[in-house]
């Protein structure tokens, strides 16, 4: 069994796109997933599955949500070891950063550093970013809401669909994935 992490984009914000976490756990169980746990109310789940294709799991979860809830929700699934790699590869690890203002944008495909080649980092200071394998790390010390750089990360510049999680959530999900892998042993 492989440990996976599912990240659902744009749910439970306001009154639209409501996906109760109990329902998410039930949908994942219905897809053959085991050891299903959710974190927060924002579409984060850790689970095991015998399959080896995270993209197929994401597609299956999207279909289940559409069928059962009538919602179109983009889902991103990563192997637990890949989420641990995201944490371990933190390009800002040597700095004290407010984890609530430090985001990881998880992409549907490979990150494209060339998509950012024309950006003048000084124009977005004090915000900073670094491009990973299938993610972009983003620091917004003055907050995310008014960050011009954060707005770019949700636009077409990325070339891929994405969903963001703050560092607190990323590290907690990585820890949950580690625990699940150890327990499933």
Where are the regions that the model predicts?
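Surface-exposed, charge/polar-rich loops and edge strands
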Residues: 2-185
